[in-house]
Amino acid sequence: MPVTVVNRIVVTIGIGAVVLFGLGVPTNAQPPPQHGQEQQDKKDAKQQKAQKKQEKQAGREAPHDQQTLVRQQQQRLAQYREHLEQQQRVAEQQSAQLERQHRRAQYRLQQHYLARLQQQQLRIQGQADYDYSRDPYFSTPPSYRYFRGDRYYETNQYGVDLLRQAVNYGYDEGLRTGLADRQDRWESNYRDSFAYRDANYGYGGFYVDRDDYNNYFREGFRRGYEDGYGDRSQYGRFTDGRGTILDAVLASILNVQAIR
């Protein structure tokens, strides 16, 4: 889940208003006139309340402090470890199916993907004693907003860099998958790939929710697959043994806006 910052609104109520509504006023007493500053404070508070309501309706994540972020991160890692174990079993079934279909190029590619995923899983299992106090992500306030569907989320530079990585990793994997299907003379279908359905390669369980990483990985994958299967370079290029999505395409996918 993306990170937001706690915005506490403190409204100063004038002494006259407290006396009038909180303590009661004798019948022969007259409440003091409201000052201009007091009226402005009430107006600001009303605007802040309306803004919070709009943000909630827009689907903005609830704000969290640093300790809450750490607790969420620990829970996220635990759930991710379990998910990766389940994905290993799914991958074994997919590999057996590829062998039955004699899709040799796709089978080799998937085995390579699984080997990298297993290495990633080992690294995540070693995060039990992770020192969150030394990770600047947890003390860096949000500075960017990104949109997904009808919701928007806030994160800092570390989160944006991870989402950018997701798109590029997805493009590279999609490019290779498209090439493999073409070599196997198999019908074009990027959704049939385990890597597309898994979409976890490169995700270490930190900074952004897995659903967000998966979403942007698949966005890159789909475009990479189209380039690979069609033997073209519409969305990216292949240099130094790796596929990289074009900057303009990447920017249109991420749709990131600076907020401060």
Model-derived segments and spans:
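Short N-terminal segments immediately surrounding and downstream of signal-peptide cleavage
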Residues: 32-49
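Sec-dependent N-terminal signal peptides
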Residues: 1-31
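Intrinsic-disorder/low-complexity detector
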Residues: 6, 29-30, 52-60, 64-260
